[in-house]
Amino acid sequence: MKMKKSLVALCLTAGLFASVPGISLAEVNYVPQNTSAAPAIPAAALQQLTWTPVDQSKTQSTQLATGGQRLDVAGITGPVAAYSVPANIGELTLTLTSEVNKQASVFAPNVLILDQNMTPSAFFPSSYFTYQQPGVMSADRLEGVMRLTPALGQQKLYVLVFTTEKDLQQTTTLLDPAKAYAKGVGNSIPDIPDPVARHTTDGV
């Protein structure tokens, strides 16, 4: 699905494990069930958020500048995106994509997974969402595929997407369009510097 970069900050796709195509991602040493590195969020604050339902057969897009929500918690900076996904359909695969916009900025996502009781069950830091080069139908983006096995009896999971002050101090090196074109047509790769995208709170 092609989406306009100026309108999309985050795209979340939920589906059954077998239905999601493989994506090459850099190896990241992490244990998703270890939530100790995630910000501590009071239950009352989580309950005040509006959780957008995600249909596993569709892509859910959120423009953080206009559709993000505020969560005033230490360790979280800027607007957040909050989704709910069905947990009673077996093993889940969530693909989160954050596209680089025309101003060469990008939202570096962190993802906290909560069970139906709003208890943290998995955490994916921003380092998990790696840079993916543009393709025919895709833009420069940060992307990560999260595979989850909900506990028996769970009806839904909650997915909280946010960025941090530490992430805002970092950048992502992109592939220069001329290099991407040369690579695509089989020409020699020009020796030119790659653009650098700064990290922002809203991806716009």
Task: Label the predicted regions.
Residues M1-L25:
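Gram-negative bacterial Sec-dependent N-terminal signal peptides
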Residues E27-T62:
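Predominantly extracellular/luminal regions of secreted and cell-surface proteins
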Residues L64-N88, E143:
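Non-catalytic, beta-strand-enriched accessory regions in extracellular/secretory proteins
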Residues A81-S84, A122, V136-T149:
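Exposed aromatic-hydrophobic patches
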Residues G90-L94, R147-T173:
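Noncatalytic modules at the cell exterior or secretory-pathway interfaces
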Residues Q103-N110:
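Short coil-to-beta strand junction motifs in C2/discoidin
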Residues F123-P134:
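Solvent-exposed serine/threonine-rich low-complexity stretches and specific carbohydrate-binding patches
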Residues D167-V204:
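Edge beta-strands of jelly-roll/beta-sandwich modules across compartments, strongly enriched
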